[in-house]
């Protein structure tokens, strides 16, 4: 399998939305979403827009605001742009509250970067990886599914789950809602890997791998590790490194088994009859990656992710949750919940515990539990506030997003009507001039320069 010198990454996060006044629900999610997107519609004439930083912001099915980062070719850029999405939506929430007040509606708009609501509906965090096109996806899928099923132990967001057998704390939010290993649908069957073939690039050379099994992360550290570890495994596949056969007998049962065991001791069965824990599966991938790094070397981004992967697995092996506080979301939230329960003598099923679970994911920097930990310096960061604020306005400089951002900015300043998507830039004038950008790595293009000059 040929390899990529650079890789393109992107993350799409859907957000939960609600509006309450003194704890009571004030507006339906649909009504809140309309207020939230009023500012967007006023300048974009649509609730589906591309922004000057190259990202896409739109209202998804079920009144979920969704932010898709621009194309990033570094993990730290990706973290910055993922966090920029939170800032952009937080700003829209403030505008929505102000507009509601003008119309005599008092209420707080909550945007939650989580994956399930109180009614049991699930919404996603989708990761995108550019890969080299191969004719047969079988090998790719065989290797990736056990990795992704077990990756929740380092990247899960955690959740209090109320089941018929009583409450439990689950490692992953999405695990309950995944029904297939591989599928071309995202909502109906909720697979681990979505195979719908939309590369948003030269289809003869590239494929866009669409992973929909992951949780949304509050922790920058977890986002970096989640995507970084996946990038390393893709590199091993591209380099045709021999990997142990870890094919799971039943991936869907396995993902739930691993999710329901915070001690990480429960085993899952492989096709070859062996039984391994999720931690052992992750360690098997990590050991192969470490050997590759010692022999050949990983790029700096991935080498940093490898160090973080080692740190996470070592702490989980030692059951050292303190070492992962502020880094791994499910561990951080569980630590907060256990302390809260002990202080107030509350059962796991208590509504106050469920409320704390939600508050962890509130993107408001005033209210959000994780945000408050960050403000107190209790959380390690990959990027600082200045970098995030820059990402709110500016696209990554080294990918196609730079061209899209320049075009949008120029067209808006000149009050020109335009249409853009991931691949096309179009001026809606008599000439209907369109530029098609098939290379996601190209941040300069003479055709775009000419289009900008004509504006």
Swiss-Prot record:
Its EC number is 6.3.1.19. Mg(2+) binds at residues 12, 58, 66. ATP binds at residues 56, 69, 422. Keywords: ATP-binding, Ligase, Magnesium, Metal-binding, Nucleotide-binding, Ubl conjugation pathway. One of its GO terms (biological process) is modification-dependent protein catabolic process. Pathway: Protein degradation; proteasomal Pup-dependent pathway; Protein modification; protein pupylation. Signal peptide: none annotated. GO terms for molecular function: ATP binding; ligase activity, forming carbon-nitrogen bonds; magnesium ion binding; ubiquitin-like protein transferase activity. Pfam families: Pup_ligase. It catalyses: ATP + [prokaryotic ubiquitin-like protein]-L-glutamate + [protein]-L-lysine = ADP + phosphate + N(6)-([prokaryotic ubiquitin-like protein]-gamma-L-glutamyl)-[protein]-L-lysine. The keyword rRNA-binding does not apply. The active site is at residue 60. Belongs to the Pup ligase/Pup deamidase family. Pup-conjugating enzyme subfamily. Catalyzes the covalent attachment of the prokaryotic ubiquitin-like protein modifier Pup to the proteasomal substrate proteins, thereby targeting them for proteasomal degradation. This tagging system is termed pupylation. The ligation reaction involves the side-chain carboxylate of the C-terminal glutamate of Pup and the side-chain amino group of a substrate lysine. NCBIfam families: pupylate_PafA (TIGR03686). The reaction mechanism probably proceeds via the activation of Pup by phosphorylation of its C-terminal glutamate, which is then subject to nucleophilic attack by the substrate lysine, resulting in an isopeptide bond and the release of phosphate as a good leaving group. HAMAP family: Pup_ligase. This is Pup--protein ligase. It comes from Acidimicrobium ferrooxidans (strain DSM 10331 / JCM 15462 / NBRC 103882 / ICP). The gene is pafA.
């Amino acid at each position: 399998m040929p390899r990529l010198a650079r890789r393109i990454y992107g993350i799409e996060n859907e957000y939960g939305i609600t509006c309450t006044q003194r704890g009571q629900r004030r507006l339906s999610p649909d009504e809140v979403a309309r207020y939230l997107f009023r500012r967007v519609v006023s300048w974009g004439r649509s609730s589906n827009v591309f922004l000057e930083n190259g990202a896409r912001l739109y209202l998804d099915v079920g009144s979920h605001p969704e932010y898709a980062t621009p194309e990033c070719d570094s993990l730290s850029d990706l973290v910055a742009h993922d966090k920029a999405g939170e800032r952009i939506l937080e700003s829209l929430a403030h505008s929505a509250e102000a507009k509601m007040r003008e119309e005599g509606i008092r209420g707080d708009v909550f945007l939650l970067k989580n994956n399930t609501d109180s009614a049991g509906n699930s919404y996603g965090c989708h990761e995108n990886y550019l890969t080299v096109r191969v004719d047969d996806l079988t090998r790719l899928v065989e290797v990736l599914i056990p990795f992704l099923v077990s990756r929740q132990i380092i990247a899960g967001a955690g959740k209090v789950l109320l089941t018929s057998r009583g409450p439990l704390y689950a490692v992953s939010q999405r695990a309950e809602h995944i029904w297939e290993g591989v599928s071309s649908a995202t909502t109906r069957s909720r697979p681990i890997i979505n195979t719908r073939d939309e590369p948003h690039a030269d289809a003869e050379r590239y494929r866009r791998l669409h992973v929909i099994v992951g949780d949304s992360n509050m922790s920058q550290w977890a986002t970096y590790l989640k995507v970084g570890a996946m990038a390393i495994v893709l590199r091993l596949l591209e380099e045709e490194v021999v990997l142990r056969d870890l094919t799971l007998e039943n991936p869907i049962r396995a993902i739930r088994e691993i999710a329901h065991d915070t001690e990480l001791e429960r085993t899952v069965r492989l096709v070859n009859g062996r039984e391994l824990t999720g931690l052992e599966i992750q360690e098997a991938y990590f050991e192969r990656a470490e050997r590759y790094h010692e022999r050949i070397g990983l790029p700096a981004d991935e080498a940093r992710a490898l160090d973080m992967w080692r740190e996470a697995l070592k702490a989980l092996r030692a059951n050292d949750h303190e070492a992962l506080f502020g880094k791994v979301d499910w561990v951080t939230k569980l630590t907060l919940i256990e302390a809260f329960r002990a202080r107030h003598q509350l059962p796991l099923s208590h509504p106050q515990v469920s409320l704390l679970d939600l508050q962890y994911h509130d993107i408001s920097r005033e209210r959000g539990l994780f945000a408050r930990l960050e403000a107190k310096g209790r959380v390690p960061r990959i990027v600082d506030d200045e970098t995030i604020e820059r990402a709110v306005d500016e696209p990554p400089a080294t990918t196609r997003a730079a061209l899209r951002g320049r075009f949008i900015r120029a067209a808006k300043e000149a009050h020109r009507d335009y249409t853009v998507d991931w691949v096309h830039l179009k001026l809606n004038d008599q000439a209907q001039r369109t530029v098609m950008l098939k290379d996601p790595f190209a941040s300069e293009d003479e055709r775009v320069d000419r289009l900008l000059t004509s504006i």
